[in-house]
């Protein structure tokens, strides 16, 4: 168990702690990082209590329950022996940057290596050290230089980190902090097209919308509208509308990426949002696959499109709800893990548009390939489920 305490490193810290970075103030970001790092209690000088903090606490009950406001003269708790995680309120500290500090005990204290040489150390310290500085910590007076000196005297262990950390000392450092945050916006499931196309576009949208009251779910609904426009372009597609459909689908994907980025940047992640995002992605892909069959002409190809749409739906359901070890097991291999990603889907759409333009009579080939290929993922998962476990 660990306790966290936000402190002010110097006289310039209070306005910087209240400065917004990607839609949330630095002080709020530090509080959330402490909560997500596992802090059971987050002590915060009442000097940092402002309207933005209060709004965040209303939106995040778990954070509100963990935060304890410190006032001048409040006594330090002498009973608890849990170490303190000291966090400068005017720095950008991502939760992933705190992992090395909390990975192992530190009897003499530990300090985040990138912060060790500066006046705003991020440190895990034993209770006696906090007791020495408690009067100033509780009153919200600057303690950065004094803390840095005591850590050196105590022989605190410097621990490296790869997580984002930026010491914001002047207002011009806020831009660097925002850039560091953007590095964290990708997710493990991102494909090559996601990283090099969608994320590049979505970050422009996210930068704008995090400064507005727009919610991630509202952005998701916009991506649905754009996706429906892409489906319309592929339905009974012409050479022109097929290529237009590809471009509209690109825009839908960019907006779809922005909703998750906004949610992560503003701490609005939710189960509802995740389910809505998955549902919209599935609707768009299913609709486009069905459109490919309809555009190929004839009742038979319409049925082929319906078969492909069914396969996409089943694959999406299996990928969403199966345990990871079943969804992608060693016997299925990496191929099925990537069979439904957007890179492959783009290849399908571009192939369809090219054939509609250059060889219209051959577009049915794409619909047939999709109808057969879309079954591979869910059939592979089903085979793994039915296979006896060792």
Spell out what each predicted region is.
Residues 188-233, 237:
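Conserved small-residue-rich
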Residues 58-120:
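Conserved beta-loop-beta/alpha segment of the NTase-like Rossmann-fold superfamily
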Residues 7-11, 44-49, 87-91, 115, ...:
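Structural motif
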Residues 1-52:
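N-terminal glycine-rich phosphate-binding loop and ensuing alpha1 helix
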Residues 203-211, 260, 264, 274, ...:
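Short amphipathic alpha-helical coupling elements at transmembrane boundaries
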């Amino acid at each position: 168990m660990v306790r966290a305490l936000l402190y002010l490193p110097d006289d310039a810290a209070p306005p910087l702690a209240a400065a917004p970075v990607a839609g949330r103030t630095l002080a709020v970001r530090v509080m959330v990082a402490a909560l997500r790092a596992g802090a059971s209690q987050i002590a915060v000088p009442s000097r940092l209590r402002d309207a933005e903090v209060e709004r965040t606490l209303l939106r995040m009950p778990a954070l509100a329950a963990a935060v304890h406001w410190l006032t001048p003269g409040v006594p330090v708790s002498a009973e608890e022996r849990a170490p303190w995680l000291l966090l400068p309120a005017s720095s950008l500290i991502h939760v992933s940057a705190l992992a090395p500090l909390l990975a192992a005990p530190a009897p003499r204290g530990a300090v985040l290596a990138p912060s060790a040489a500066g006046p705003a150390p991020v440190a895990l310290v034993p209770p006696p050290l906090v007791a020495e500085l408690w009067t100033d910590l509780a009153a919200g007076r600057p303690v950065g230089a004094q803390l840095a000196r005591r850590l050196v005297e105590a022989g605190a262990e410097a621990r490296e980190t790869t997580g984002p950390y930026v010491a914001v000392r002047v207002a011009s450092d806020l831009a660097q902090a925002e850039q560091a945050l953007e590095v964290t916006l990708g997710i493990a499931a991102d494909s090559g097209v996601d990283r090099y196309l969608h994320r590049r576009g979505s970050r422009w949208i996210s930068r704008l919308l995090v400064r507005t009251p727009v919610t991630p779910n509202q952005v998701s609904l916009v991506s649905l509208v754009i996706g429906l426009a892409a489906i319309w372009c592929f339905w009974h597609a012409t050479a022109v509308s097929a290529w237009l459909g590809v471009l509209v689908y690109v825009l839908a994907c960019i907006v779809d990426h922005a909703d998750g980025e906004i949610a992560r940047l503003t701490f609005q992640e939710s189960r509802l949002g995740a389910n809505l995002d998955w549902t919209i992605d599935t609707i768009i892909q299913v609709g486009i696959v069905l459109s490919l069959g309809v555009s190929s002409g004839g009742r038979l190809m319409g049925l082929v499109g319906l078969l492909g749409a069914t396969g996409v739906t089943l694959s999406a359901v299996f990928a969403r709800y199966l345990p990871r070890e079943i969804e992608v097991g060693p016997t299925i291999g990496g191929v099925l893990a990537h069979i439904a990603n957007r890179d492959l889907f783009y290849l399908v759409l571009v192939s369809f548009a090219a054939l509609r333009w250059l060889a219209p009579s051959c577009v049915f080939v794409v619909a047939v390939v999709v109808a057969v290929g879309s079954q591979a993922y869910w059939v592979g998962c089903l085979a793994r489920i039915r296979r006896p476990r060792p």
